[in-house]
């Protein structure tokens, strides 16, 4: 089915008042863009309270964001979209926005995400896609300016790390930490934050992964489309490359992770970005940043299941625990975290790889 073909499944609305408000808004914006209201159908939903609809127009299809204002603030999306467009990234344009009601009309970048087209093995075609992602990331980071986006600071890092004991351990695993275990975890969290906050700061997408990168409809367009950027911050330069290569939904062997990461590092160095001059040190920073993200995401996915009724996300928990365990077992300073995770998960520890235990 093409992107412009009507979907046989109607759009469901749980709130009749919001449904009526949507149709009123759509009638107002339709003439300016030659929209066809009868073609509205679901496009996608994400882990938030936003959802996306697709609608046809005379010039092709468009995307509508449905973001209830009491649940979602669209202002950051609009701001970051402008920053990314100015940096030369391929992002959807905001064509119409009803801020009080949370309806937005956007360009349609396509229906195929990068995660849908990459091969199961790291083929040359897959490598080429990842290098296109690296190019987008470097363009984004080169546009960085302090004071424009919220800082990815210690309070934010601490709130994110707290999701692991609060939601993954306590609510998902049903584990009540002993005072000694809590003290150990807090000390490990302080160490993780200290290491990550030492990294130079740039613009950070925060979910820069194949699920949020789009394959352009136009084969001549070299830039991947970039989505889901509304939570962008100013923080560690190691974050987005860690997110790209230690994906929440896709795992790669260390050889491929190293290959793409070193290519990113080489391009970043040449572009003048503030990466460590030694790749080994830089990669260790990437691993420590990835560890923070995986602890956070394990907690978020538990919360999505237990609080928000979205159980599909927690199915990927073993991937995060594997990431956490691999990094914690590689670094001596993280041995207490490795032991705690092994106690919780009831599995033998893994050994380090690539750089070995350091």
Locations of regions flagged by a protein language model:
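An alpha-helical support segment within catalytic cores of ATP-dependent transferases
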Residues: 22, 29-31, 145-150, 156, ...
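Active-site activation/catalytic loop segments of kinase-like enzymes and analogous catalytic loops
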Residues: 165-172, 238-274, 288-308, 320-327
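Secondary-structure capping and boundary motifs in well-ordered enzyme cores
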Residues: 129, 205, 230-237, 283-291
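ATP/Mg2+ or Mg2+-diphosphate-binding catalytic cores
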Residues: 296-358
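Conserved N-terminal boundary motif of the eukaryotic protein kinase catalytic domain
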Residues: 36-41
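ATP-binding pocket architecture of kinase catalytic cores
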Residues: 43, 48-157, 162-163, 169-174, ...
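Active-site acidic catalytic loop and adjacent metal/ATP-binding pocket
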Residues: 49-56, 64, 94, 103-104, ...
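Juxta-kinase regulatory segment immediately upstream of eukaryotic protein kinase catalytic domains
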Residues: 2-33
């Amino acid at each position: 089915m093409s992107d412009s073909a009507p979907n046989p499944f109607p759009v469901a609305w749980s709130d009749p008042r919001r449904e009526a408000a949507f149709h009123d808004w759509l009638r107002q914006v339709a003439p300016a863009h030659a929209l066809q209201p009868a073609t509205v159908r679901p496009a996608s939903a994400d882990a938030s309270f936003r959802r996306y609809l697709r609608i046809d127009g005379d010039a092709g299809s468009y995307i509508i964001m449905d973001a209830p204002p009491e649940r979602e603030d669209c202002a950051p999306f609009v701001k970051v979209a402008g920053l990314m467009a100015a940096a030369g990234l391929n992002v959807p344009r905001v064509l119409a926005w009803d801020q009080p009601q949370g309806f937005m009309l956007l360009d349609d970048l396509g229906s195929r995400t990068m995660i849908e087209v990459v091969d199961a093995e790291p083929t040359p075609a897959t490598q080429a896609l990842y290098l296109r992602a690296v190019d987008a990331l470097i363009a984004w980071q080169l546009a960085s300016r302090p004071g424009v986006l919220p800082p990815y600071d210690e309070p934010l890092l601490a709130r994110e790390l707290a999701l692991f004991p609060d939601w993954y351990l306590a609510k998902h695993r049903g584990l009540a930490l002993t005072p000694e275990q809590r003290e150990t975890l807090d000390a490990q969290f302080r160490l993780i934050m200290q290491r990550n906050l030492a990294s130079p700061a740039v613009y950070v997408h925060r979910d820069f992964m194949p699920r949020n990168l789009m394959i352009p409809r136009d084969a001549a367009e070299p830039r991947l489309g970039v989505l889901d950027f509304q939570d962008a911050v100013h923080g560690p330069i190691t974050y987005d490359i860690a997110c790209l290569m230690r994906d929440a939904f896709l795992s790669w062997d260390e050889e491929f992770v190293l290959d793409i990461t070193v290519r990113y590092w080489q391009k970043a160095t040449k572009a003048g970005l503030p990466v460590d001059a030694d790749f080994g040190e830089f990669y260790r920073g990437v691993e420590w940043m990835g560890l923070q993200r995986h602890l956070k995401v394990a907690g978020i996915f538990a919360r999505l299941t237990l609080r928000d009724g979205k159980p599909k996300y927690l199915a990927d928990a073993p991937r995060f625990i594997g990431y956490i365990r691999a990094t914690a077992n590689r670094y001596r300073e993280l041995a207490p975290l490795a032991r705690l995770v092994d106690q919780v998960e009831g599995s033998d520890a893994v050994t380090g790889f690539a750089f070995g235990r350091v």
